[in-house]
Amino acid sequence: MRRTFFLMGLLLLALLPARAGHTPPKVTLRIHVQTTGEGQSTLEVAQIRVPPAGDTILIRAIPELSEIELIGVEQDANGLHLQFNHTGTVDLNAVTAQNQGRLMVVIIDGNVVYAPTIDTQISDGQLTIPHEMPPAIVQLLQQVAAQNVRKANRS
């Protein structure tokens, strides 16, 4: 009897990813905002270390933006330029308007790559990380952005 339930559980776990309808992204981009944690449960906040000093801060556990909203990626001498779709533009606008003085934490593949203090509202849907990223990461982000554009065009 236990063996049957165990096998049924394994079968269910094996089928869940197929039922989800998509594969996980090859690269993750998460943009979080610093929070005080007041009035929030421990499930709503996470601790993270931010460069350069390695200070520990609290961020909202659910990201404000992710690779799902990404539609353009370019790298030049000024850094990595990220362009977000309409939803991402609205979210970035709201986050930067409502959280002046807090840190915005940009995480790529689990690594904090940029953590500026929000001092201006970003209303054009473009975020620049002011340093170069490894070409392999840039290429993966560009692939995700292109896939998002194709998906939007089919809708």
Range-by-range predicted roles:
Residues R2, R19-S155:
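Structural signature of multi-pass, alpha-helical inner-membrane proteins
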